[in-house]
């Protein structure tokens, strides 16, 4: 009987890397950010291809270690984002009317968004991803 190798398959290694994430506070909301993924945040005052650093990191989870929870923020932690595009969200229609009256009001709104790609998640200058 031949022994099976004990090395991890490549899929498992990729899964370990994708298990790392950070929960950050941006635009008045909390986002779960994973490396090499893109997200839409409220409009940031940065040009396309600029790098933005978020310092308000609430939690960091490495693929192999336990989570590091901040009180309220993790000290020395940061997330680097690259601005990919400025775009607008879907149109939201707000329609108000009063029954049995001739009062009707229709408004439309499109939120200004910035699409960002997560470059790296780091703690104390050491990149997790």
UniProtKB/Swiss-Prot annotation:
GO molecular function: rRNA binding; structural constituent of ribosome
Annotated GO biological process: translation
Bridged cysteine pairs (disulfide): none
Keywords of this entry: Ribonucleoprotein, Ribosomal protein, RNA-binding, rRNA-binding
A GO term from the CC aspect: cytoplasm
Coiled coil: none
The organism's place on the tree of life at top rank: Bacteria
Function: This protein binds to 23S rRNA in the presence of protein L20.
PANTHER family: 50S RIBOSOMAL PROTEIN L21 (PTHR21349), LARGE RIBOSOMAL SUBUNIT PROTEIN BL21M (PTHR21349:SF0)
NCBIfam families in alphabetical order: L21 (TIGR00061)
Subunit text: Part of the 50S ribosomal subunit. Contacts protein L20.
Recorded family membership: Belongs to the bacterial ribosomal protein bL21 family.
Name of the protein: Large ribosomal subunit protein bL21
Lineage, top ranks: Bacteria, Bacillati, Cyanobacteriota, Cyanophyceae, Synechococcales
Gene: rplU
